[in-house]
Amino acid sequence: MGKRVVIALGGNALQQRGQKGSYEEMMDNVRKTARQIAEIIARGYEVVITHGNGPQVGSLLLHMDAGQATYGIPAQPMDVAGAMSQGWIGYMIQQALKNELRKRGMEKKVVTIITQTIVDKNDPAFQNPTKPVGPFYDEETAKRLAREKGWIVKEDSGRGWRRVVPSPDPKGHVEAETIKKLVERGVIVIASGGGGVPVILEDGEIKGVEAVIDKDLAGEKLAEEVNADIFMILTDVNGAALYYGTEKEQWLREVKVEELRKYYEEGHFKAGSMGPKVLAAIRFIEWGGERAIIAHLEKAVEALEGKTGTQVLP
C-alpha cells in the first residue's frame, strides 16, 4: 500500500467566507473537496479524514436557542451538539466522496465514526475558559443566561457578548483502536470531526464535558493513533508565514521541525488561527511522522507532492 495520510479539512471545505451555510452551499463545497480527496486516493495514498465544525456547531446552538425560546424544546449540551455535527458533516463528506470514487470506477468503503476525544479533567483550560461559542448577545442577555445556565460569558472583540468554554488539550480517542482496524482493512474513515466530542474518564466511566477541542491538535493525535506517514492540514491560506500580514511577510516552504518550534515559541503564529496548526505539525514530526503539511485546500494534491504549502520535516 501507499503512504498513509491524515487530512484535516478546514472550515472552507464546508462553508466559504460570505456564505450563510445552506445545505446547497455546503454540499457544493464538499463535492469540490471530495474531488481533491478522490484524486489523492487514486494516486495510491491511504486516507483518513478529519474536519472542523465551528460554524455548524454555532448554527446548531442557535437552532436550539430558537427552539427553546419558541417551542420550549430543551436545548442539548455542547457535547451533544458536537456529536450531532459529526453526524451531519460526516454524512455529507462520506456521500460526496463515495460518489466521486464511483465516478472513477473505485469501489471503496467510506464511513464516519462518531469520535470521543479524551481530555484530562485537571487540564488548566477548565479553570480558564477562552473559546467563544454560539451566538452573540447583548450584555444584559448574556449575563442573564450566565445566571440561569451557569455559563461563563465574556465580551468578544467589541462585537458583543458570547459564551466561552474550555479548550483542553486532546490526549487520545476512545475509538482509536476501531478506527485503526478499519483503516488497516482499506476503509476510508472520517473521524474526530470538530476535534471530537470532549470526554473525561471519571470513576471508570466516560463522561461528556462542555468544551471545544482544537480539530488540528485532535487530528494530530488521530494521525499518531493510525500510524500515519503524513499529516496534512488544509486551510484557506497557502501555508505558514513569519510576520504574516506585514511588509516583512515570509512564507515558509520547507522547514525543519526544530526551526519551526523556535518560530512557534517566538510567537510568530496567532493562537486562534495558525498557532494550533503549527503546533499540531510540530507534534506530529516530534512523534515520529515523516512529513507534516499546511496548505491551501484547493492545492491539496500539489501539496502532497511537495510542490506547494509549508512542508515540515524532521
UniProtKB/Swiss-Prot annotation:
<comment type="subunit">
    <text>Homodimer.</text>
</comment>
<dbReference type="InterPro" id="IPR003964">
    <property type="entry name" value="Carb_kinase"/>
</dbReference>
<dbReference type="GO" id="GO:0008804">
    <property type="term" value="F:carbamate kinase activity"/>
</dbReference>
<dbReference type="GO" id="GO:0005524">
    <property type="term" value="F:ATP binding"/>
</dbReference>
<dbReference type="GO" id="GO:0005829">
    <property type="term" value="C:cytosol"/>
</dbReference>
<dbReference type="InterPro" id="IPR036393">
    <property type="entry name" value="AceGlu_kinase-like_sf"/>
</dbReference>
<dbReference type="GO" id="GO:0019546">
    <property type="term" value="P:arginine deiminase pathway"/>
</dbReference>
<dbReference type="Pfam" id="PF00696">
    <property type="entry name" value="AA_kinase"/>
</dbReference>
<dbReference type="InterPro" id="IPR001048">
    <property type="entry name" value="Asp/Glu/Uridylate_kinase"/>
</dbReference>
<keyword id="KW-0547">Nucleotide-binding</keyword>
<comment type="function">
    <text>Carbamate kinase that plays a biosynthetic role in that it produces carbamoyl-phosphate.</text>
</comment>
<protein>
    <recommendedName>
        <fullName>Carbamate kinase</fullName>
        <ecNumber>2.7.2.2</ecNumber>
    </recommendedName>
</protein>
<keyword id="KW-0067">ATP-binding</keyword>
<keyword id="KW-0418">Kinase</keyword>
<keyword id="KW-0963">Cytoplasm</keyword>
<keyword id="KW-0808">Transferase</keyword>
<comment type="similarity">
    <text>Belongs to the carbamate kinase family.</text>
</comment>
